[in-house]
């Protein structure tokens, strides 16, 4: 799985990290499982900046995960 990350810095400090994960899925269960996996990984990132992960297929966004700086748990949404 490849991914592309983009960081937004102010005065050398990371404020927001956006990660796009392009992937091809073959069913809803794969989207759910992969989203859960990435959700768990995000909990290991520092909480000092906003982080968003967009999991997308060729045609559409499959799921979205977002955690605001300082929050303990990310928010996620899986699109139908």
Region annotations inferred by a language model:
Residues 61-79:
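Short, low-order "capping/linker" segments at domain edges
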Residues 2-22:
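Short edge beta-strands and adjacent turn/loop segments
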Residues 17, 32-34, 66-68:
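Surface-exposed beta-strand edges and their flanking turn/coil or helix-capping segments
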Residues 11-13, 43, 80:
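Detector for Asparagine
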Residues 29-50:
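Short, non-transmembrane amphipathic alpha-helical segments
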Residues 45-67:
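A short amphipathic beta-strand at an alpha->beta junction
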Residues 23-27:
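A generic structural motif
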């Amino acid at each position: 799985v490849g991914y592309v990350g983009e960081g937004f810095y102010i005065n050398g400090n990371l404020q927001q990290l956006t990660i796009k994960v392009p992937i091809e899925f073959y069913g809803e269960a794969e989207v759910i499982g992969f989203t859960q996996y990435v959700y768990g990984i995000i909990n290991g990132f520092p909480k000092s900046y906003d982080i968003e992960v967009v999991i997308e297929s060729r045609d559409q966004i499959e799921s979205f995960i977002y955690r605001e700086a300082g929050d303990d748990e990310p928010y996620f949404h899986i699109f139908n």
